[in-house]
């Protein structure tokens, strides 16, 4: 008979499956509470690492349409429900599993595709979204930077060929503009004096 607590737990796990773009099933036998807390911190806010009951998880997975965990729910089980960057979360999990042999990555899924443990490790080996975006930005920025260098080189070449008169004329033009501004400023000051006579 389903108790309200179990129904609520199934609903929560089902919701976690539906809201996640990826999930990784782990066995955490032998990890301390402090180690689990450390793992949760390393996963960040976009990943929920939850210790779950196998029978309730099987029901929730079926309700959510997740088949990746069929036959894998045995032993002390925890699931990383990933709502953000799946690569970064998979990397955090695999790094933690390397440092703490008690955490065993069993299986997972990413965007609806079932992953075995080696595929989760392969996902972790990919570059993070931020690094990929930085590379794209660099590729997009490179032509503009190259064009700026070419234009600057052409400007320098023209200045060398013309003996740099363009650079010498610019200060002279500024001086004549300053002289005109000073003359304009002095003229109104003298005009009222002339009216008094």
Curated annotation (Swiss-Prot):
Disordered, as annotated region: 163-197
Domain of life: Bacteria
CDD domains linked: Ribosomal_L10 (cd05797)
One Pfam family named in its UniProt record: Ribosomal_L10
Subunit organization: Part of the ribosomal stalk of the 50S ribosomal subunit. The N-terminus interacts with L11 and the large rRNA to form the base of the stalk. The C-terminus forms an elongated spine to which L12 dimers bind in a sequential fashion forming a multimeric L10(L12)X complex.
NCBIfam families the record matches: PRK00099.1-1
Protein name: Large ribosomal subunit protein uL10
Gene, per the UniProt record: rplJ
């Amino acid at each position: 008979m389903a108790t309200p607590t179990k129904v609520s737990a199934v609903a929560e796990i089902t919701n976690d499956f539906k809201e996640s773009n990826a999930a990784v099933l782990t066995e955490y036998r032998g990890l301390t509470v402090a180690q689990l807390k450390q793992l949760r911190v390393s996963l960040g806010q976009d990943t929920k690492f939850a210790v779950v009951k196998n029978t309730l998880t099987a029901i929730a997975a079926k309700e959510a349409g997740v088949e990746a965990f069929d036959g894998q729910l045995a032993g002390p089980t925890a699931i990383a429900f990933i709502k953000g960057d799946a690569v970064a979360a998979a990397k955090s999990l695999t790094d933690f599993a390397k440092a703490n042999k008690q955490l065993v990555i069993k299986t997972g899924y990413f965007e609806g595709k079932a992953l075995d443990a080696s595929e989760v490790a392969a996902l972790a080996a990919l570059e993070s979204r931020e690094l990929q975006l930085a590379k794209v930005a660099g590729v997009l920025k490179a032509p503009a930077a190259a064009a700026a260098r070419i234009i600057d080189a052409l400007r320098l070449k023209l200045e060398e060929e013309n003996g740099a008169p363009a650079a010498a004329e610019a200060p002279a033009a500024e001086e004549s503009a300053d002289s005109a501004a000073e003359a304009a400023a002095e003229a109104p000051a003298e005009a009222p004096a002339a009216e008094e006579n």
